[in-house]
């Protein structure tokens, strides 16, 4: 009964938070399209590249606060300790590190301007970006604390406020200040960062958390906390370094293919600002679920409740695979039209259709990383990410000078297929889960075939009625999606309970 209530609670929170995320992701995609039309794809590529370096600086200077607070405070709550003391450890460490990093970067802010000779990247802009690093670290800690106490709607509200302020600041500068030369693109980006992060800190700092555990004995000493935090921080830092290295290499390899610097930045901006967000846009439910299962699994691990670990992992994997297969079908069917709507040309649609097969692996990665973080397996994540990015960067260096833009897509396909196959094997072995592949793959495939026929039928009907392309995509997605979900529900009903009872007897014994 308790497990059923937990499952329903997790599903309810996932649906509600996904609705927040869908809105934010959609608005973010619209913002990228707006910036591309107003400033040009090259400027968006420049913003994306500098944003990648900013993300690296934020993570290296204390950006691991979210996962640290979410996981370690949940473990402390699970064992009846003092989570408030753990939070003080996390906040003190992250704030000290971020303030030192911001001060150091401010001192040497003249160096990038001198080396790169970019008119938009001056010392003033770099110092503005550095000023937001402590705010970024504190907001990450505050969000992680909310997740640990299961007050998951508060970070969602704060993210809405943050996005509105960031997008509003950037849009205002784009319309009124940048065209007149009163402000550079990157200075506008820096101001939007400060406005957004500041709003999150202000909002979440006003929220009071339970203090009934403050008198309990903390199971963590500061030394033990640091020993457990270092793998978490190392994993986040490694991913950020590899991701930024990959982003920096993309324009360089496009130059080797024969593109001009402006064309290289424009193609990079189109890939990162339109194509990748379009692929990730449907994954908002997986992103929310991944954040929710980290504290759930951490509490189950602290209580040595292997039954709950298996239940949560199995349910998350099943839902993710079934959902991802439907998205693959939709991208294959309507990728060209989506590309025309988002990018204004058929080339974007061709790349979306080309990359559709990698969608299940992308969405599984989101969920599996949540499982690994919840169970404290950060060392494996670090090693796997290292191998994954070695594959990605190797393919990038080989294929982009030969094939241009298609080489970027090929590198993304190669690293996701290899890295997530290994990640899935490790998660199954770690949890002792014995998935029934008939339910995970065969039944969704049967339902998918039926949904595909419905989608083709509805598409022909809508075209006959001469409906706009956008309306055709929405109607087909809604009707075929409901049919797919209904068929899956009907064919998965028999024997579900008996399988789960059987599947959850291994580790307990």
Residue map of PLM features:
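N-terminal membrane topogenesis motif
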Residues: 1-27, 85, 219-239, 495-509
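Signature of the first transmembrane helix
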Residues: 9-67, 102, 106, 132-133, ...
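Short runs within selected transmembrane alpha-helices of multi-pass transporters and secretion channels
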Residues: 24, 32, 51, 62-70, ...
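Helix-loop junctions and terminal segments of transmembrane helices
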Residues: 63-78, 279-313, 317
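Alpha-helical transmembrane segments of multi-pass membrane transport and lipid-handling proteins
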Residues: 91-115, 310-361, 393-394
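Hydrophobic transmembrane helix module of multi-pass membrane transport proteins
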Residues: 95-241
């Amino acid at each position: 009964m308790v497990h059923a209530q937990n499952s329903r609670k997790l599903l309810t929170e996932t649906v509600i938070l996904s609705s927040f995320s869908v809105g934010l992701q959609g608005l973010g995609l619209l913002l990228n399209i707006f910036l591309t039309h107003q400033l040009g794809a090259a400027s968006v590529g420049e913003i994306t590249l500098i944003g990648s370096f900013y993300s690296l600086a934020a993570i290296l200077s204390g950006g691991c606060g979210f996962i640290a607070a979410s996981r370690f405070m949940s473990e402390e709550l699970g064992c009846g300790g003092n989570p408030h003391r753990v939070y003080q450890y996390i906040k003190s460490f992250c704030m000290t590190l971020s303030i030192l990093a911001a001060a150091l970067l401010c001192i040497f802010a003249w160096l990038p301007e001198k080396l790169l000779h970019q008119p938009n990247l001056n010392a003033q802009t770099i110092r503005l970006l550095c000023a937001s690093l402590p705010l970024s670290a504190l907001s990450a800690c505050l969000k992680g604390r909310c997740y640990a106490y299961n007050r998951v709607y508060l970070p969602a509200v704060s993210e809405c406020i943050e996005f509105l302020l960031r997008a509003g600041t950037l849009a205002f500068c784009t319309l009124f200040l940048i065209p007149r030369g009163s402000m550079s693109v990157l200075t506008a980006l820096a101001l939007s960062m400060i406005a957004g992060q500041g709003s999150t800190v202000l909002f979440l700092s006003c929220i009071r958390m339970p203090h009934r555990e403050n008198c309990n004995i903390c199971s963590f000493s500061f030394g033990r906390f640091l020993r457990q935090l270092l793998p978490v921080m190392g994993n986040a830092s490694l991913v950020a370094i590899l991701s930024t290295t990959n982003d920096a290499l993309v324009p360089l390899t496009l130059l080797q293919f024969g593109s001009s610097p402006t064309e290289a930045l424009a193609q990079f901006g189109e890939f990162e600002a339109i194509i990748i967000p379009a692929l990730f846009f449907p994954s908002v439910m997986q992103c929310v679920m991944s954040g929710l299962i980290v504290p759930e699994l951490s509490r189950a691990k602290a209580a040595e409740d292997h039954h709950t670990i298996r239940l949560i992992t199995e349910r998350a994997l099943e839902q993710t695979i079934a959902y991802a297969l439907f998205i693959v079908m939709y991208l294959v069917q309507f990728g060209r039209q989506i590309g025309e709507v988002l990018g204004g040309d058929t080339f974007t649609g061709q790349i979306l259709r080309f990359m559709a097969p990698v969608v299940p692996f992308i969405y599984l990665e989101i969920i599996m990383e949540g499982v690994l973080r919840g169970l404290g397996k950060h060392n494996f994540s670090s090693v796997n990410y290292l191998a994954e990015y070695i594959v990605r960067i190797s393919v990038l260096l080989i294929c982009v000078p030969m094939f241009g833009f298609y080489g970027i897509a090929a590198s993304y396909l190669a690293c996701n297929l290899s890295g997530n196959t290994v990640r899935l094997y490790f998660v199954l072995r770690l949890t002792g889960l014995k998935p029934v592949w008939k339910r995970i793959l065969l039944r969704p495939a049967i339902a998918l075939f039926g949904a595909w026929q419905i989608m083709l039928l509805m598409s022909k009907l809508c075209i006959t009625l001469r409906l706009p392309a956008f309306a055709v995509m929405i109607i087909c997605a809604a009707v075929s999606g409901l049919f797919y979900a209904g068929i899956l529900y009907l064919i998965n009903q028999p024997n579900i309970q008996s399988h789960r009872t059987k599947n959850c007897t291994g580790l307990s014994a």
